[in-house]
């Protein structure tokens, strides 16, 4: 059973005109985003619109479980998740309400949102992006030996790689993207090669992998970009020292581009405040909110033509654009079942 931290949620909506009127001035949010800067976003939205945000925090899996358990009685209006595959699963489990929003459809690229329904409705939209990058010990590894995901399986990297659990959503999404690019047969061989190159059994989170590289426990790690940026911007000198010992590469610049995952949002299927929910998602795609995502949590905007000024992200990319993959992010979710089967066959935990 997943535990929830309830911050200000009305657990039941009573019948009656007064209650209905009051409900129209709130958005009940189920969020897997646990970032301090997001609180400022919610406050700004309330100041601008008068619509109060009542938030429940959990992880993606906990939100899905709660929505399923609550069914039509759910008070949720908006769902925020931090993984494309989980958003795809929520869509297929019929937990979200397809919507039409000219604002969202204009600014969020088609490959960073759900495929449209027959009537044009879209069930979820990416709101920020994060790259799955390769970190490496610059004193021991040449950048050209880790400049693609495929090279993680190269025998020359045997015994060098640290990675969190293969079944973690961030890795599942990467593996789903690689499968989409190279096909299931080659992806199976690749996964086996990556497993064979591990320096230790998978453990810990992404930051732990970066620190393991800095400590010499391994030479190569796979991580989301914002974890490295956090170390670079940390007020803790030890964190900065870790970042200074490690370099990152944005893989596959000469082929399909670096894999991007998303944090995204959807209107809950049984939303009692649909109009407010859509307004909130539109606000999260606005330049103001997109800049918060980039500068506050070291993510890249999902919306088009938003300028940001994050020194860590600039340093990571050498202040140049990087090539990212352009496959529909929904394709990553559709590959999850076969990816799990491939991991089982490889014994990659």
What are these regions (language model features)?
Residues 17-23:
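Sec/Tat signal peptide C-region and signal peptidase I cleavage site
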Residues 23-89, 349:
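Early extracytoplasmic/lumenal segment of secretory-pathway proteins
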Residues 30-33, 120-124, 136-138, 144, ...:
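Short beta-strand->loop
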Residues 74-79, 97-134, 150, 161:
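A structural signal for short loop-to-beta-strand junctions that line the ligand-binding cleft
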Residues 87-95, 117-147, 175-176, 260-266:
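Periplasmic solute-binding protein
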Residues 166, 170-173, 177-251:
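Ligand-binding pocket segment of bilobal, Venus flytrap-like solute-binding proteins
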Residues 263-326:
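Mature extracytoplasmic/periplasmic domains
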Residues 309-349:
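Extracellular/periplasmic bilobal clamshell ligand-binding domains
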């Amino acid at each position: 059973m997943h535990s929830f931290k309830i911050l200000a949620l009305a657990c039941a909506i009573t019948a009656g005109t007064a209650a209905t009127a009051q409900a129209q001035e709130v958005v009940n949010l189920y969020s897997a985003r646990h970032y301090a800067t997001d609180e400022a976003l919610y406050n700004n939205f309330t100041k601008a619109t008068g619509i109060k945000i009542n938030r429940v925090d959990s992880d993606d899996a906990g939100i899905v479980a709660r929505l399923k358990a609550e069914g039509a009685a759910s008070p949720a209006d908006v769902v925020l998740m931090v993984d494309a595959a989980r958003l795809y699963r929520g869509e297929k489990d019929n937990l979200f309400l397809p919507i039409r929003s000219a604002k969202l459809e204009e600014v969020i690229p088609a490959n960073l949102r759900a495929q449209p329904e027959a009537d044009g409705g879209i069930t979820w939209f990416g709101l920020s992006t994060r790259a799955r990058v390769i970190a490496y010990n610059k004193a021991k590894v040449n950048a050209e030996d880790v400049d693609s995901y495929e090279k993680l399986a190269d025998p020359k990297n045997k015994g060098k790689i640290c990675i969190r659990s293969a079944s973690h959503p961030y890795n599942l999404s990467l593996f789903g993207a690689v499968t989409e690019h190279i096909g299931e047969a080659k992806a199976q061989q690749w996964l086996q090669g990556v497993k064979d190159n591990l320096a230790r059994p998978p453990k810990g989170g992404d930051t732990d992998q970066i620190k393991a590289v800095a400590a010499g426990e391994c030479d190569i790690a796979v991580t989301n970009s914002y974890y490295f940026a956090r170390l670079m911007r940390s007020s803790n000198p030890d964190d900065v020292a870790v970042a200074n010992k490690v370099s990152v590469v944005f893989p596959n610049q000469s082929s399909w581009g670096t894999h991007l995952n998303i944090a995204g949002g959807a209107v809950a299927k049984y939303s009692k405040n649909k109009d407010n929910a859509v307004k909130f998602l539109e606000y999260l795609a606005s330049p103001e909110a997109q800049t918060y995502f980039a500068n506050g949590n070291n993510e890249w905007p999902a919306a088009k033509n938003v300028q940001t000024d994050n020194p860590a992200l600039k340093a990571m990319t050498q202040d140049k654009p990087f090539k990212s993959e352009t496959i529909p992010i929904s394709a990553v979710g559709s590959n999850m079942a076969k990816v799990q089967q491939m991991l089982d066959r490889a014994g990659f935990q």
